[in-house]
Amino acid sequence: VPEHTSSIAHRLAALRLWFNETRDEADASRLASPPGGAAGALSLLLVAGIALSMTDAVGDASDWTHFARLLSRLGATEAAQSLAGWMREPVEGSNHRLIYWALNCQIWYLAVPLLWATAAARIPLSELGLGVGRLRAHLPAYAFLALLLLPLLLYVSAQPAFLRVYPYFDPLPGAPLWPDFWRLELLYFAQFAAVEFFFRGFLVQGLRSTFGYASIYVSLLPYCMIHFGKPLPEVLASLVAGLVLGHLSLASRSIWPGVVLHIFAAATMDLAVLWRKGLLG
């Protein structure tokens, strides 16, 4: 057998062993969980369902009008009018609406689940992936994914569907990117921390003791659905990303490498698109 063929087979065997160890460990935690865990899982799923529903109902960039109407009904007419003026500002209105969206992500994907987990369910934050876990042992896998993503991101950044969507926040015409655009990008990046916590921490880690390795699959469908409206390749890629990031979250017991990887992908895409549009010079 050629040496390179043997090396590939060895690496594939090591990868299979790593996958099986993570799956078996997650399933062992399910088998070892005390009776009555289903009630806690049901409560967690209910909170997740409310968070997803509210994000869809009032959290999109175009849904600020619901909040404005609520302010009016509460008697805060001037605040509602100020909000409307801010959202409809001719030059920066589109970015203001995206700020509204990003802040809603922080509320529904991060603050509400965290409040329930700490105040009601008494779940340690480390059990939801917010600790360092076994991060160091799995950093090479995340670094490999970043290297794998780089050429793919550079390729799709030239496609018309992605050029229309990205960057999410629009640079002001004729204005330098720093500081205004990059301040908005920081808010955009923070949104990914909330998303990673919700899907890979709250759902995957939070449901590990009830569903075992299948907690990844529980989180996969809603994760794909939040990408609806984006370019089709990105929607389909979210299924692969959900599986891979879910597995790595279970393996490392931490969401933080996934947060960094998500931010790396977003920053690379935005920089590549800005460069292709001639806005980096």
Regions found by a protein language model. Give the residues of each.
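N-terminal, membrane-interfacial amphipathic/helix-forming hydrophobic leader that caps
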Residues: 1-124, 273-281
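Residue-level signature of transmembrane alpha-helical entry/exit and packing/kink sites
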Residues: 36-45, 98, 102, 106, ...
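Generic structural microfeature
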Residues: 45, 123-126, 134, 202, ...
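Juxtamembrane helix-loop-helix connectors linking adjacent transmembrane helices
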Residues: 67-105, 119-191, 209, 279-281
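Long, contiguous hydrophobic alpha-helical segments, chiefly transmembrane helices and signal peptides
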Residues: 109-110, 128, 223
